[in-house]
């Protein structure tokens, strides 16, 4: 996967955006919160349009909590500093609860967003330390199917859960 030296320029316009994330377990439709997290949505949209997430796995799956992906190394460690090659600031304007289907950026501390994201499997009381930028509106059963896979001691699925493609739509 290509590394970038800095975050992409704003490519999104004053519209609403959605995505279809196609996995080997089914499809999920995501509606993005462009007003709450424009920089984060722009980051995800631009990476997805470049095919960045294609063939990347969900490397961390915790049933009763969340599913996490977006690291091309497939480890959860490759994003920080290496992928996508930059970090950007949190957008913590959104005080939505972390409910099933909420999509947020994974990070290793304040202002360390890159390409990794997680999708909530269930409602969970997380601190507002993660930029919430979207919500699954169709395909919640896909989250359940992914969350049901067997994992190792590090929460990595024993069978690959693959993001086959991400299709972005402007509405």
List each language-model region with its residue ranges:
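Acidic helix-start/capping segments at beta-turn-to-alpha-helix junctions
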Residues: 57-74
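Secondary-structure capping and domain/repeat boundary segments
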Residues: 13-19
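Single conserved hydrophobic/aromatic residue that forms the stacking wall/gate
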Residues: 1-12
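Extracytoplasmic/secreted envelope proteins and their assembly/folding machinery
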Residues: 18, 38-45, 49, 63, ...
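Sec-exported extracytoplasmic/periplasmic mature domains
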Residues: 37, 46-53, 63-67, 93, ...
């Amino acid at each position: 996967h290509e590394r970038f030296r800095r975050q992409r320029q704003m490519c999104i316009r004053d519209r609403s955006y959605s995505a279809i994330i196609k996995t080997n377990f089914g499809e999920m439709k995501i509606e993005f919160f462009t007003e709450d997290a424009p920089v984060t949505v722009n980051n995800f949209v631009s990476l997805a349009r470049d095919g960045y997430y294609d063939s990347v796995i969900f490397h961390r799956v915790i049933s009763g909590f969340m599913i996490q992906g977006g690291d091309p190394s497939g480890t959860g460690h490759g994003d920080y500093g290496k992928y996508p090659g930059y970090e950007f600031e949190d957008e913590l304007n959104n005080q939505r609860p972390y409910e099933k289907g909420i999509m947020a950026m994974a990070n290793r501390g304040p202002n360390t967003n890159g390409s990794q994201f997680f999708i909530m499997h269930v409602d969970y009381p997380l601190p507002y330390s993660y930029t919430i930028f979207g919500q699954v509106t169709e395909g919640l059963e896909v989250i359940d199917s992914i969350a049901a896979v067997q994992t190792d001691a590090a929460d990595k699925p024993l069978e690959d859960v693959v993001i086959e493609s991400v299709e972005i739509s402007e509405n």
